[in-house]
Amino acid sequence: MKIIEFRKKIPYLRYLEMQEKLRKFRKECILFLEHAPTITGGINYNPENLLVKPEFLESMGIQIHWTQRGGDFTAHEPGQLVLYSHVDLKKRNLSIRFYLENLLRSVIDSVRSTWDLQLISDSDSPGLYLESNPSQKICSIGVNFKSFFTSHGIAFNLSNDLKTFRCINPCGRNWTNMTSVKDLGLDFGLHKRDELISCLKKNLCSFLEPINVSSS
């Protein structure tokens, strides 16, 4: 399995093309990247949770795409760390539940190691929330399990300004419930981003055993 860090922002459509090729050839790969301002709707999206018209999004330079991942609407923007994980569950004999639990556990442990920040999950609303304020969401999750090969993944709010979230009710909740490392007054510098990625690699390796780390 390869782990690739993209230093430049990746267009969302380019990612959709990449994940289809990875699934077609069942090539395992973990990607770390950022997107330009983008709104995506999952297979369970509620039209009422899109608060503005597509024409307004276009005028603001915000893309909108419909995807096959689970969940409702979410947003991507610069400063948000996106982790896309492509894993062959069939080959590894892993259950969907095991994969999701360990993906979230990897993020929880990595964030705690990086900032001493405690996160919790919510079985009624996927994602990760502040233990000190469970209404505040800092990490979104949406995964596709087609053919028992995963795609999409998690989006962690690091230094993004959260403005794109104002156009939606993310996962059906008010956008004001979203927070970020920056909003919490914690160090969000590049060295912290790199530290978080390093921790994520280590924790993901503990249950996926990836190899061949590279950068792009």
Swiss-Prot record:
GO terms for molecular function: lipoyl(octanoyl) transferase activity. Residues 24-212 form the BPL/LPL catalytic domain. Substrate binds at residues 69-76, 140-142, 153-155. It catalyses: octanoyl-[ACP] + L-lysyl-[protein] = N(6)-octanoyl-L-lysyl-[protein] + holo-[ACP] + H(+). Pathway: Protein modification; protein lipoylation via endogenous pathway; protein N(6)-(lipoyl)lysine from octanoyl-[acyl-carrier-protein]: step 1/2. InterPro entries: aa-tRNA-synth_II/BPL/LPL, BPL_LPL_catalytic, Octanoyltransferase, Octanoyltransferase_CS. Its EC number is 2.3.1.181. The active site is at 171 (acyl-thioester intermediate). GO terms for cellular component: cytoplasm. Keywords: Acyltransferase, Cytoplasm, Transferase. GO terms for biological process: protein modification process. It is found in: Cytoplasm. Transmembrane segments: none annotated. Its main location: cytoplasm. The record marks 137 as: Lowers pKa of active site Cys. In the reaction, the free carboxyl group of octanoic acid is attached via an amide linkage to the epsilon-amino group of a specific lysine residue of lipoyl domains of lipoate-dependent enzymes. Catalyzes the transfer of endogenously produced octanoic acid from octanoyl-acyl-carrier-protein onto the lipoyl domains of lipoate-dependent enzymes. Lipoyl-ACP can also act as a substrate although octanoyl-ACP is likely to be the physiological substrate. Belongs to the LipB family. PANTHER family: LIPOYLTRANSFERASE 2, MITOCHONDRIAL-RELATED (PTHR10993:SF7), OCTANOYLTRANSFERASE (PTHR10993). NCBIfam families: lipB. This is Octanoyltransferase. It comes from Leptospira interrogans serogroup Icterohaemorrhagiae serovar copenhageni (strain Fiocruz L1-130).
